[in-house]
């Protein structure tokens, strides 16, 4: 990998356009997060949905699969294109690492033989303490003492069966790394700041008229997304 100052990152925005500003919010979250931890790095965005554009992975240190508002189990042509791209990149360009979040986590699992499904209890919008496995505590030393990392979850689908050749770094199929060490996935959103996470949780609570306390909502303690992404940057050279 190049040094952090020369870091090159490609982000695939994996969501169809709609009447909201969701796509621009996704871009801004990644732009701000990487600017915080790699301010001189280069971040490029690609649209695999409408433009069907994919990065030349050989030009990048890291390819990121974003979240998205579509079923990761569907067979839309662009979804199948993302799955093929991930498989080919991981196989043919192992020096380029792949990071996948939320929908991307599910898509990667499907691409390599795992199973995804709708969340049985319905859509999840919550800040959660995600419990680590023994392997996860070794991979995320900053979280070894607590045994968990804290991040926001925003999803209606989940990984039901993990893909062969992937190691669980967190319980409940929340985080995987493959055994060739070039694909890392999170169900949670490390790119979303604590401020935005808190805003989203409060809006969801207000929508359902719960008006819960900050403690009940889980927004009283900061999320650890930047710590997770800092660990991702360290991983690029491992």
Swiss-Prot record:
Free-text disruption phenotype from the record: Affects the production of 2-(2-(2-carboxyacetamido)propanamido)benzoic acid and downstream compounds and accumulates 2-(2-aminopropanamido)benzoic acid.
Active site (UniProt): 102 (nucleophile), 189, 191
Hydrolase in keyword set: yes
Highest taxon in the source lineage: Eukaryota
Any GO molecular function: hydrolase activity
PANTHER family linked: GLUTAMINE AMIDOTRANSFERASE YLR126C-RELATED
Protein name in the entry: Glutamine amidotransferase-like protein chyE
